[in-house]
C-alpha cells in the first residue's frame, strides 16, 4: 500500500468510517473533505488518509497515481 491513501465516493457510503479505521490501524493522520484532485496533488503529504466526495475515479487515475485509491459505493 502506498503512503498516501484516498477514499472517494458519494455522501453516506461510509468513507469517513473506513478512513478512521485505516488511519488508526496504520497510525496515519486523517484529512476529511478534500476539495479537489488538484488541491490534493499539490498539498498531499505521506502517511495520511484523505477523504473526498468530489474527486472522481477518473480524476484519481489521472492525477493521483502515487496514491492508494479506494472507491466506496452503496450496494
What is the predicted role of each segment?
Residues 4:
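Walker A (P-loop) ATP-phosphate-binding motif of ABC ATPase nucleotide-binding domains
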Residues 14-15:
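Conserved glycine(s) of the Walker
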Residues 29-75:
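Conserved nucleotide-sensing/catalytic segment adjacent to the nucleotide-binding pocket
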Residues 25:
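Active-site catalytic microenvironments for nucleophilic, acid-base chemistry
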Residues 21:
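Active-site signature of alpha/beta-hydrolase-fold catalytic machinery across serine-
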Residues 7:
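Hydrophobic anchor at the beta1->P-loop junction of P-loop NTPases
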Amino acid at each position: 500500500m502506498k503512503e498516501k491513501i484516498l477514499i472517494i465516493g458519494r455522501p453516506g457510503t461510509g468513507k469517513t468510517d473506513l478512513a478512521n479505521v485505516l488511519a488508526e490501524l496504520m497510525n496515519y493522520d486523517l484529512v476529511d473533505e478534500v476539495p479537489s484532485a488538484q488541491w490534493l496533488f499539490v498539498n498531499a503529504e505521506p502517511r495520511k488518509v484523505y477523504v473526498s466526495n468530489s474527486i472522481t475515479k477518473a480524476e484519481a487515475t489521472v492525477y493521483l497515481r502515487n496514491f492508494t485509491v479506494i472507491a466506496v459505493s452503496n450496494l
